[in-house]
Design a protein with these regions (language model features):
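Structural signature of Gram-negative outer-membrane beta-barrels, strongest in the C-terminal barrel
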Residues: 109-125, 129-149
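Cleavable N-terminal export/targeting peptides
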Residues: 1-29
Length: 222
């Protein structure tokens, strides 16, 4: 009986040590590709000039689609570059739309953007089992706008104009800092992240405006 109990305790110790090892240093780590699709809440910041700031835009929404490549570095630490396409929108608050009206009755003014994102995340995953992993990650993200339109709609008016270039007042390129958490089960992935704009998106240095967002992602890892 004592020999049986001793064997059981040894076996439990081996299992416990193995589980702890996988939790922070899984020897089965390997590089892999993954696809990601996400829905996002766009959170434009205040427009500020000196000490004065105004909330000019409502929050909006958007989608993104792309891929990642997860590269193990040491233990369960990894680097994960990616490439994604996005489309998102946000609108001018109704109080400001009403203020701009003159002879034209406006229903709304919105910003619509399409472009590319290149995130480079650094993270660590905790492997609770062979199939269940919790990811914590953070890092920079380059965002380049291919197309951006200010759309005005109202009674007897429906028009769009570019927000970039000589006729626009916004910059195409932004750098954001992101952080988030993800849960992987087998090959499937779900994550939530926030990204905070670091660059002034107005091309007038006397005015400051930053774009932020929250993203909910689904994915598959190969």
């Amino acid at each position: 009986m004592k020999r049986f109990l001793l064997s059981a305790l040894v076996a439990l110790g081996v299992v416990s040590a193995s589980a702890q090892s996988y939790l922070v240093d899984n020897p089965a780590n390997r590089a892999y590709f993954g696809i990601r699709v996400g829905g996002e809440v766009t959170c434009p910041g205040k427009i500020t000039g000196g000490p004065v700031g105004i909330k000019f835009f409502n929050n909006g929404g958007g989608v993104e689609f792309g891929g990642i490549y997860n590269i193990p570095v040491v233990a369960n630490f990894y680097v994960e570059p990616g490439l994604k396409l996005y489309y998102n929108t946000y609108s001018v608050k109704k109080d400001w739309v009403d203020l701009f009206q003159d002879d034209i009755v406006l229903d709304g003014v919105s910003v619509r953007k399409f472009g590319m994102r290149v995130p480079v995340m650094a993270g660590y995953h905790f492997d609770f089992t062979r199939d269940v992993r919790l990811h914590l990650f953070t890092g920079p993200e380059l965002e380049v706008g291919f197309s951006g339109k200010e759309h005005i709609s109202g009674k007897n008016i429906d028009m769009s104009s570019s927000i970039y270039g000589d006729d626009g007042n916004m910059n195409r390129v932004d750098v954001l800092w992101g952080a988030g958490v993800g849960l992987a089960y087998d090959h499937f992935y779900f994550g939530v992240s926030g990204s905070f704009g670091l660059c002034n998106m107005y091309n007038d240095s006397s005015v400051k405006f930053h774009e932020n967002r929250v993203t909910f992602s689904l994915g598959y890892n190969f």
